[in-house]
Amino acid sequence: MDVADAQVGQLRVKDEVGIRAQKLFQDFLEEFKEDGEIKYTRPAASLESPDRCTLEVSFEDVEKYDQNLATAIIEEYYHIYPFLCQSVSNYVKDRIGLKTQKDCYVAFTEVPTRHKVRDLTTSKIGTLIRISGQVVRTHPVHPELVSGVFMCLDCQTEIRNVEQQFKFTNPTICRNPVCSNRKRFMLDVEKSLFLDFQKIRIQETQAELPRGCIPRAVEIILRSELVETVQAGDRYDFTGTLIVVPDVSVLAGVGTRAENSSRHKPGEGMDGVTGLKALGMRELNYRMAFLACSVQATTARFGGTDLPMSEVTAEDMKKQMTDAEWHKIYEMSKDRNLYQNLISSLFPSIYGNDEVKRGILLQQFGGVAKTTTEKTSLRGDINVCIVGDPSTAKSQFLKQVSDFSPRAIYTSGKASSAAGLTAAVVRDEESFDFVIEAGALMLADNGICCIDEFDKMDQRDQVAIHEAMEQQTISIARAGVRATLNARTSILAAANPINGRYDRSKSLQQNIQLSAPIMSRFDLFFILVDECNEVVDYAIARKIVDLHSNIEESVERAYTREEVLRYVTFARQFKPVISQEAGHMLVENYGHLRQRDTGTSGRSTWRITVRQLESMIRLSEAMAKLECSNRVLERHVKEAFRLLNKSIIRVEQPDIHLDDDEGLDMDDGIQHDIDMENNGAAANVDENNGMDTSASGAVQKKKFTLSFEDYKNLSTMLVLHMRAEEARCEVEGNDTGIKRSNVVTWYLEQVADQIESEDELISRKNLIEKLIDRLIYHDQVIIPLKTSTLKPRIQVQKDFVEEDDPLLVVHPNYVVE
């Protein structure tokens, strides 16, 4: 049965092109063979199921069978599509032996030419094309009236197969020759044909977007089996045709209505009304949309072909590559210096910072995502944060990663809101329903989200990505929409220190405006400090000049970017398992990190938690993937621990110069006068023993510089002793406090075994006195208790000795680290 004969009671001109295409396509289905048997017999038999109604046909098979038919389908697709569907229905009915006709549809795959969203113009309306894009918005599924059956209210004639033009369309006129009804019709819902309908919006990917242009978007219409097959954030290839649909949002908008009453007031002139808007009518506007017949999820091009996003094995990937590409991957996997060659090929224009490059490289491979027996997901993606001074190539790292990674989103923290990073709930223009629009983290699903100026984000916006960074999901509960969406993305963030420069005397958390929960979710922290180094500065300047003078020759790569991308994509499919030896080493290394965190040098790091152990596991798995290994070995754990250790203690606390605190205790006027009186005697001694004094001063100056760790050890030792003495005095009922001289004497007794000469004893005594002065006047850890009553001038000299040796107590608010 032909489509042209389906209209009963209405004279229509036969469509010769459509009828011929229908017969040729039915012959193709019945005759095309592959491996000696008819290819589409089994797929047609599966359409017997009530859930199936679409037959997928490879367009390459049509081209092999009849080039003229393929050309007609390409050029006249929308015109002959009903005839092609009718041929599928006839073919299915003949093969299966159905008693009743079943409405079937055809979907073409493997259309050779892919077009960009920006290339969709009116010249492509009605042709079969394939476009690619990223889904940014999905609408709910609702029924669509495709073909209506109407009843004339005047003569009761049934009018069948009234095609709906993407809006409710009444018959133009009653098909009864003796009836001239044009308005009064009623829809017969029971006999009309409804299909599932879903509308989605896609936009250009960042790789296809010309510089300085706004991403173009187009609406995709999905029907029948294609609904609910796409997810916001994923990239797909859509095969179908570009169509023109009425702009229903304009029709449903607020406008002027036709007035039934008189349009003029009594006494006014009877002037005519001009213009359709004055009559209460609206202009019918049209817009372009894409009617899809097949959808395929894809990632970036791999080995010259498109690689599906579903789980694939090494054998599947091998089939997608040529022999030369496979041999190159095998050769790279055997490279003894692969680790270094990959980072030199990935960042050829950035000098130095090899540790940062290694961390970002391991982020490309990622760990292994796991699911526990309680259905709890453990993320495998690695999050990296780069903190550093201006002009240390932070943004350059992010830009190169966003250009290299097949699925990467680059955004700025200050210009991004919480909804822009996660997901937004917006109102549909046509149905006025609330729909979810994907944010940056959803668009970077199974990829990397590069966030620059991470520290400039508002606090509430940082809180919004807590869940996405650890659970890798985004939960939304607003405007009546409750949903949990996937955000399986790695985050590469760049942040600046608070005052523009990294302060070595402060801890990492004190240098950046990030909360502790956010910091603990990063696996690696890299601190870049702009130090003045003549050798490094010369090398960086030479590199920059070479890049500006001769860009191509100055870039040295061991492998091309395509080879690195192909190798990373291939290695990511490995799922390495932790060996027993590697597990023991992971536990030992985590114990070392925790012990060091509780030590005195822990101020320079952030808090070590169980998340750092999981970070070490992910980094170890990434190292195993880099070597295409199915097992995590001890050497992988060793490198992961080294990298994590490097990122945690990248910047140490500076040495403490006790000589800088000289004079802090000289603010007392009496003390100053006494020193002035004794200057003459001191000068005479210096004149007689000039050489000895200078030598002794040099020795003392060396001793008065302590490392931060030694300084913390000594200060903690004194504080604990003084608090023990304070507690003892309080129990005995004596005055609280301990004399300064007693503290010095106690310390010298503790280190008596280490003192071998009188000079060393004097040096130790001067050192501990300087240390006590710093704790009093600089750190304000110790409080000196001095007499506050006024005394006669005569008693000043007598009481000076007592004031020079005051009682010392520990500040009550001081907490020992």
Curated annotation (Swiss-Prot):
GO terms assigned for molecular function: ATP binding; ATP hydrolysis activity; DNA helicase activity; single-stranded DNA binding; zinc ion binding
ZnF start-end (C4-type): 152-179
Known partners and oligomeric status: Component of the Mcm2-7 complex. The complex forms a toroidal hexameric ring with the proposed subunit order Mcm2-Mcm6-Mcm4-Mcm7-Mcm3-Mcm5. The heterodimers of Mcm4/Mcm6 and Mcm3/Mcm5 interact with Mcm2 and Mcm7.
UniProt KW Metal-binding keyword: yes
Protein's job: Acts as a component of the Mcm2-7 complex (Mcm complex) which is the putative replicative helicase essential for 'once per cell cycle' DNA replication initiation and elongation in eukaryotic cells. Core component of CDC45-MCM-GINS (CMG) helicase, the molecular machine that unwinds template DNA during replication, and around which the replisome is built.
GO BP term, example: mitotic DNA replication
Source organism superkingdom: Eukaryota
Gene: Mcm6
UniProt tissue specificity: In stage 12 embryos, strongly expressed in the CNS and weakly in the gut.
Signal peptide: none
Main location: nucleus
InterPro entries cross-referenced by the UniProt entry: MCM (IPR031327), MCM6 (IPR008049), Mcm6_C (IPR041024), MCM_CS (IPR018525), MCM_dom (IPR001208), MCM_lid (IPR041562), MCM_N (IPR027925), MCM_OB (IPR033762)
Effect seen on changing K394A: Slihgtly reduces complex helicase activity
Keywords assigned by UniProt, alphabetized: ATP-binding, Cell cycle, Cell division, DNA replication, DNA-binding, Helicase, Hydrolase, Metal-binding, Mitosis, Nucleotide-binding, Nucleus, Zinc, Zinc-finger
Gene Ontology CC terms, in alphabetical order: CMG complex; MCM complex; nucleus
Additional record remark: Early fractionation of eukaryotic MCM proteins yielded a variety of dimeric, trimeric and tetrameric complexes with unclear biological significance. Specifically a MCM467 subcomplex is shown to have in vitro helicase activity which is inhibited by the MCM2 subunit. The MCM2-7 hexamer is the proposed physiological active complex.
Binding site for ADP: R611, E614
UniProt EC number: 3.6.4.12
Subcellular location: Nucleus
Protein name, per record: DNA replication licensing factor Mcm6
UniProt binding sites for ATP: S391, T392, A393, K394, S395, N496
Organism, as annotated: Drosophila melanogaster
Family to which the UniProt record says this protein belongs: Belongs to the MCM family.
Catalytically driven reaction(s): ATP + H2O = ADP + phosphate + H(+)
Keyword Hydrolase: yes
